[in-house]
Amino acid sequence: MRLATSADRSQVARLVAARCDWMERRGLPSWRDSLDDLVAQCDNPDGDVWVLDSDEHGVVGQMVVQDQGPPWGWTAKERAEPALYLSGSVTDPAVRERRPGTVMALWAVDRAARLGVPWVRRHCHFPEVARYNRTQGFTLVRTEQRTHARLFMMARRAERLDLTRVFREGTPAQPGQGR
């Protein structure tokens, strides 16, 4: 994992387009209309956009990691607690057997612990993604109905993890986990 740079734009465009193709083939809503915005995140001056870079495949994941979450979905007490907030995770479906989304999430859990931040939080729009996030150790805190979306608010305590094998080999899929 490393911070995204402008030099990553073409690889991120490739990975987002591949994910859009994958989603569309399955009849799922795609991010194709947001492709340019997702690629533009590589130029984010706030230094909160990270990529998972593979020696073999190039950039295989992108994720936003911020120290402040959205103003909705979390209680005032939760918002007052230090946490890393994950959003905008996109992975290359060509390497899904290595579970790059899980690799990125576990990296964030370890990073939070190294920074002394007790929580990693995230939200998602689909129950299938919430189930996948649970395989990464996240728990469902609550659901929140927004105007046009039902959100699954999820959290996991930070902890130090030995990520050597995870980065080298990916993480094995659990039975029934095809993501």
Segments (PLM) and residue ranges:
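Conserved GNAT-fold acetyl-CoA-binding loop/helix
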Residues: A17-A40
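C-terminal "cap" of GNAT-fold acetyltransferases
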Residues: A18, F126, T139, R146-R179
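A short helix-loop-beta-strand connector motif used in the catalytic cores of GNAT acetyltransferases and
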Residues: V39-V51, G61, Q68, Y85
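Conserved GNAT acetyl-CoA-binding A-motif
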Residues: A112-H125
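Conserved active-site tyrosine of GNAT-family acetyltransferases
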Residues: Y132-F138
